[in-house]
Amino acid sequence: MGYISVRNAHKEFMKDGEPLTILEDVNLDIEKGEFICLLGPSGSGKSTLLNAIAGFELVTSGSITIDGEEVKAPQLRYVTVFQNYGLLPWRTVESNIELGLESKKVPKEERPAIIDKYVKMVGLDH
């Protein structure tokens, strides 16, 4: 069993009063620190699976666990990076970056140096 484990995941939506199967018996194990890529055509269920793993949607049947805990809702200790940038417009760039550090419980006094490092790395310091 992986750090992230998907077992017999099934997801249906209702469309025009009929069930539409998006995920069918999906099984997947991802080890901690492992990098994977989900590939498939548009509409094949990639985003639905990721939303279920993140806890934004529940599977119709089957189970998803992270570090042995069943996923039933989004968890503050896990950070999701969205395809469409989801910056909080009332926060600065630095403050948006700090959200991830807060969720990982990085000490407040260490955050400015970390933020500065990555802002410079991606060229946002100009």
Give the predicted meaning of each segment.
Residues A54:
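Helix-to-loop junction immediately C-terminal to a conserved catalytic motif
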Residues I36-C37, T80:
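Short beta-strand immediately N-terminal to the Walker A/P-loop
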Residues L39-P41:
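The feature captures the beta-strand-to-loop junction immediately N-terminal to the Walker
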Residues G62-A73:
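Conserved ABC transporter NBD signature motif
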Residues P107-H126:
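Conserved ABC ATPase "signature" region
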Residues E94-E102, P112, D116:
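Short helical segment in ABC ATPase nucleotide-binding domains corresponding to the A-loop/adjacent helical element
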Residues R77, Q83, T92-E94, L99:
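Beta-to-alpha transition at the N-cap of a short helix in the ABC ATPase nucleotide-binding domain
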